[in-house]
C-alpha cells in the first residue's frame, strides 16, 4: 500500500502514487491515441505554425473567413505571437468554447449583432457561466474588457489565457 504519510488520521481515501505509476503517466508513448496524446501538447508558441497551417485547421468552420478585412487565421497567428500561446492551442480553445459551426453559422457571442451588446466579441467565452444567461455574461465581460472588434477579442483574449494559465507554469 502507498498510504501517504502526510494524510490526516481517518483520511484513508488518498494514497501516494508508486514510482512505476508515475513513470507510466508521464510517458506519452502510453497515450498514443488521437484524443489522449493532446495532454502532452506544448501550449507555447511554435514558430513553425504558419497562417496557412492555421487556415487548414479552421477550414469549413466559422473561423474560415474574415472580419474587417483580415482573415481569422491571421488574427489567431497574431494572437499567438502576442501571447506566447500556440496558435493550435488557441484554435482548439475557441472550438472548445464555441463549437466548430459551419462558416455560415457564426456563434452569437462572436457575431457582433447582439441588440444589447452590439459590436462586442468574446471568442473564448470569458465570463460565461452555466445557465440561461451565459451569452449575456460573456458579452458583458467582453464589453467591459473593450473587445469591440474580432481582432481585439482574439488577441487580448489570448493574452489573458496565456497570463492566467501558460505563464503560470501550467
Regions found by a protein language model. Give the residues of each.
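Non-transmembrane alpha-helical segments in soluble domains
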Residues: 91-94, 158, 162
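Solvent-exposed loop/turn segments at secondary-structure junctions
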Residues: 96-101, 126-133, 164
Amino acid at each position: 500500500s502507498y498510504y501517504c504519510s502526510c494524510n490526516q488520521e481517518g483520511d484513508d481515501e488518498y494514497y501516494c502514487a508508486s514510482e512505476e505509476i508515475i513513470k507510466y503517466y508521464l510517458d506519452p508513448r502510453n497515450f498514443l491515441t488521437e484524443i489522449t496524446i493532446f495532454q502532452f501538447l506544448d501550449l507555447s508558441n511554435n514558430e513553425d505554425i504558419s497562417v496557412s497551417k492555421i487556415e487548414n485547421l479552421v477550414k469549413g468552420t466559422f473561423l474560415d473567413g474574415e472580419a474587417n478585412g483580415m482573415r481569422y487565421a491571421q488574427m489567431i497567428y497574431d494572437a499567438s505571437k502576442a501571447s506566447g500561446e500556440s496558435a493550435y492551442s488557441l484554435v482548439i480553445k475557441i472550438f472548445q468554447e464555441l463549437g466548430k459551426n459551419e462558416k455560415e453559422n457564426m456563434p452569437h457571442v462572436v457575431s457582433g449583432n447582439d441588440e444589447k451588446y452590439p459590436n462586442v466579441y468574446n471568442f473564448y467565452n470569458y465570463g460565461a457561466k452555466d445557465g440561461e444567461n451565459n451569452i449575456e455574461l460573456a458579452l458583458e465581460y467582453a464589453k467591459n474588457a473593450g473587445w469591440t472588434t474580432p481582432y481585439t477579442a482574439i488577441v487580448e483574449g489570448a493574452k489573458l489565457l496565456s497570463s492566467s494559465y501558460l505563464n503560470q507554469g501550467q
